[in-house]
Structure formats: structure tokens, C-alpha cells
Swiss-Prot record:
Name of protein: UPF0246 protein TM1040_2658
GO cellular component: cytosol
Family label: Belongs to the UPF0246 family.
InterPro entries according to UniProt: YaaA (IPR005583)
Organism whose genome encodes this protein: Ruegeria sp. (strain TM1040)
A Pfam entry, by short name: H2O2_YaaD
GO process terms (BP): response to hydroperoxide
Length: 251
């Protein structure tokens, strides 16, 4: 079982610097995208990403400085809600090894990352357009490349399933049809409030991080074993779940 998670907007360069030991699979493609992004003005970046002028300047400067010679480990660089529960910095050696083999971070700029892949600070969400590039969007740019890489890695590991713990925005970069015979499992985490159930964004992100860690620490390899996930008070709901859409409820 290969595990997919999203990156995060919030970064921790200090923690990640000097910890990278591997080169991203799609470094050439990242360089191509960074070259395109380098041509964007601060105003364009602000509009494309829906961010403030201050953040637009920061990211304009990041693209200008991007060299392809990253020094920060991807797994330690990202610092959002998913990573507060995943906590790669606290993995023991066995879990680190499992994460390097099985955990993959989807990225708008780098495509697909291992925890120790060397990256530079950036912001480029997967759902964005790419003015100046004929693909038009990041989905168009990546096409089936990411899915093909996952299929190749799954074959090398001898596994038959992918645990999708990424957000909808990032999961769209991995079309199920492009995964061939691999089974795509996409858990859903719901909160029960006042007699109704719904997905709450922050809670779902943390639950995805917690499940990723739980799977790695416990050596979970079969989809059926995911039913045992109870971290954070969640419980598997057999009545509303489907084989490729297990639902976990808390409340």
C-alpha cells in the first residue's frame, strides 16, 4: 500500500534544512515549471494564488531564487495540519524506512516527493493555472505522469493498492484510470454534531495525517485492516462505507 498525502502552504525551512538525502524524481519538470513561474509578476501571482501582495512578493522572490539545488527534506519542510499529526520528525528508524518506501507527497511543483527528497521553499498549489506554459494548468502539465510513477513504484514494492489521504485538489492529479490495476482507497472522516454528520476541513486534514502515521507505524498493508483505525476517537462505520471509500466517524 502506497500512501499519498498533500503538501502544505506553511513551511519549516529551519527544521528541514540539511536533512535531504535524495533527489526528486521530477526535478527536470520542476525546473521547467519554476522557469515559467519566474516570469510571473507579483500581481499575477497574487491573482493566480489568491494571496496578499506581501505573500506574492515572497513567492516571486522564491521563484527568482529557485536553483534546483534544494537543501530541505520534503517530509520535514511541510508544516500544515496534516503534518501536525503525521510528525515525520518523530519517526523512529523503522517508521522512517517505511515512510521512505511507502509515503509519497503530491506537489504542484515537484509532482511526487519522497520524505527525504531535496526541495526548495515554494508555493504552487495543484489546482492553479500556468500562464506562459502551453499546458494551461498544472493538471494539464502533469497529466498521467504522477500516476505512472506511482504504478511503477507499486510494482517495485509488490503492492496492489494506494491509500489516498490527499485533499481533493491534489487527488485529481492522480486519475484513477491511470492507476491501472491498483486499487485506490479514499477514506472520509466525518464529525457528528447535533444529530448530523459532516466533514470539517481542519479535522479531516489532521485525521488524514494521523491515519498515515498509524499505517506506517503499524505496518498496515491491507485495505481491510484500515477498519481498525481509532486514533483521535474515530470509528469505522460499516453501514455507510464502501470498499474503496471507508468512512470514519467521530462525535
Amino acid at each position: 500500500m502506497i500512501i499519498l498525502v498533500s503538501p502544505a502552504k506553511k513551511l519549516n525551512e529551519e527544521r528541514a534544512r540539511g536533512q535531504a538525502t535524495t533527489v526528486p524524481r521530477f526535478l527536470d519538470q520542476a525546473a521547467e515549471l519554476a522557469g515559467v513561474a519566474r516570469t510571473w509578476s507579483e500581481d499575477e501571482i497574487a491573482k493566480l494564488m489568491g494571496i496578499s501582495a506581501t505573500l506574492a512578493k515572497l513567492n516571486k522572490d522564491r521563484f527568482a531564487a529557485w536553483s534546483g539545488d534544494g537543501q530541505c527534506a520534503a517530509g520535514l519542510m511541510f508544516d500544515g495540519d496534516v503534518y501536525k499529526e503525521l510528525e515525520p520528525a518523530t519517526f523512529d528508524d523503522v517508521t522512517k524506512d517505511a515512510a521512505q518506501r511507502r509515503l509519497r507527497i503530491l506537489s504542484g511543483l515537484y509532482g511526487l516527493l519522497r520524505p527525504t527528497d531535496a526541495i526548495e521553499a515554494y508555493r504552487l498549489e495543484m489546482g492553479r493555472k500556468t500562464p506562459g506554459h502551453p499546458a494551461g494548468t498544472l493538471y494539464g502539465f502533469w497529466g498521467d505522469k504522477i500516476a505512472a510513477a506511482i504504478v511503477e513504484e507499486a510494482r517495485e514494492l509488490g503492492v496492489g493498492s494506494v491509500l489516498n489521504l490527499a485533499s481533493e485538489e491534489y487527488a485529481k492529479a492522480v486519475p484513477p484510470k491511470a492507476l491501472g490495476d491498483l486499487t485506490l482507497i479514499s477514506p472520509r472522516f466525518e464529525e457528528e454534531r447535533g444529530g448530523s454528520r459532516k466533514v470539517i476541513g481542519v479535522a479531516a486534514k489532521r485525521a488524514r495525517g494521523a491515519m498515515a502515521r498509524w499505517v506506517l507505524e503499524n505496518g498496515i498493508t491491507e485495505a481491510d485492516d484500515l477498519k481498525g483505525f481509532t486514533v483521535g476517537g474515530y470509528a469505522f462505520d460499516a453501514e455507510t462505507s464502501a470498499p474503496q471509500r471507508p468512512i470514519f466517524v467521530r462525535g
